[in-house]
């Protein structure tokens, strides 16, 4: 019987994509106020402290996360790729790229996530999804095409840095999939705290100073919502969809970011930008209308944590 992937998992993936998509044009507004290292660190500081604070409230104190020893290498690898390298590369890329173009380039994260999931983690591939990925790549190539230094058509270094960030997050997504049945708030919160400590520590060691509180506060809030809550929802989606399909649904994020960059911040665009957007939108449509009917087998899941917020209704149990 053909059926759509679990509705709750899909909604979690789309909510995660909306929050993360909004964070890109918002974070770009602070690129000139601090270094890429410091900005990435503060974004993840907001994420980590906010999520671990929610976890403490949920559990009314500290509870052991219940991670098996064999799961720690996966989680630490995810933190290194997605929490340390990815955001720094993105902030460096944003310095020479418009938020609208950077947002659309982030569609490549879903492509790279799916490729890694299919090649190394043996997830199933669907022809519609493969065609959709090809359209997204075509759009990415258009956005990366060298052009005038207007910021609307990055080309060169800016695009390469953002593609590098996408690869880091694709690795992160597949590594996180290996521990996705553990406490989502703990996984996302720990990733934020470690990423913040590394990035802020490096920035301070290089002689950089923390920004004023009126600059730091909105950055922390953007990090909490766009990186923290978004990541917790993403982990929940991974449980029901796997890395490849969660990455495909997450493809809505770049369009949210581009819409904010153009509609709110008035960024200019180019014909190549709109052509790329059409390719990527067509690719996303193929992902969202995907149906699959291959057999699934899930091992028994043992949950040792209460669900927050109402997490038992946000993912399917076997």
Residue ranges and their predicted role:
Residues 1-43, 47, 151-178:
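Glycine-/small-residue-enriched transmembrane alpha-helix faces in small-molecule transporters
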Residues 10-14, 68-78, 125-137, 159, ...:
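Cytoplasmic-side transmembrane-helix entry/capping segments in multi-pass membrane proteins
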Residues 17, 40-42, 87, 101-108, ...:
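Helix-helix packing/entry segments at the starts of transmembrane helices
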Residues 18-24, 52, 56-101, 106, ...:
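Specific transmembrane alpha-helical segments of multi-pass solute transporters/efflux pumps
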Residues 30, 39, 43, 93, ...:
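Hydrophobic/aromatic residues within transmembrane alpha-helices
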Residues 33-85, 112, 168-172, 188-207:
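Transmembrane alpha-helices of multi-pass small-molecule transport proteins
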Residues 35-47, 92-110, 154-167, 213-227, ...:
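Structural signature of hydrophobic alpha-helical transmembrane segments
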Residues 51, 116, 128-147, 199, ...:
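Hydrophobic transmembrane alpha-helices of multi-pass small-molecule transport proteins
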């Amino acid at each position: 019987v053909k059926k759509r992937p679990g509705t709750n998992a899909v909604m979690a993936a789309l909510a995660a994509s909306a929050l993360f998509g909004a964070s890109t044009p918002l974070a770009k507004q602070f690129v000139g106020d601090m270094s890429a290292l410091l900005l990435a660190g503060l974004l993840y500081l907001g994420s980590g402290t906010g999520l671990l604070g929610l976890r403490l409230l949920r559990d009314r104190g500290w509870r052991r996360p219940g991670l098996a020893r064999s799961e720690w290498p996966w989680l630490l690898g995810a933190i290194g790729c997605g929490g340390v390298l990815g955001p720094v590369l993105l902030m460096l890329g944003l310095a020479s790229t418009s938020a609208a173009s950077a947002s659309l380039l982030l569609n490549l994260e879903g492509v790279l996530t799916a490729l890694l999931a299919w090649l190394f983690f043996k997830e199933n591939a669907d022809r519609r999804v493969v065609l959709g990925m090809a359209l997204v790549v075509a759009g990415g190539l258009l956005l990366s095409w060298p052009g005038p230094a207007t910021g609307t058509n990055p080309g060169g270094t800016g695009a390469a840095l953002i593609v590098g960030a996408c690869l880091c997050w694709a690795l992160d997504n597949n590594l996180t999939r290996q521990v996705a049945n553990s406490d989502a708030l703990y996984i996302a919160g720990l990733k934020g705290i470690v990423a913040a400590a590394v990035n802020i520590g490096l920035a301070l060691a290089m002689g950089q100073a923390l920004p004023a509180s009126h600059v730091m506060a909105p950055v922390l809030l953007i990090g909490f919502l766009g990186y923290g809550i978004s990541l917790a929802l993403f982990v929940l989606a991974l449980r029901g969809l796997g890395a490849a399909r969660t990455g495909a649904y997450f493809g809505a994020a770049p369009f949210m970011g581009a819409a904010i960059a153009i509609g709110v911040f008035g960024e200019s665009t180019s014909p190549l930008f709109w052509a790329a957007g059409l390719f990527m939108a067509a690719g996303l449509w193929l992902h969202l209308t995907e149906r699959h009917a291959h057999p699934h087998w899930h091992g028994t899941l043992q949950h040792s944590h209460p669900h927050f917020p109402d997490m038992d209704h946000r993912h399917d149990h076997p």
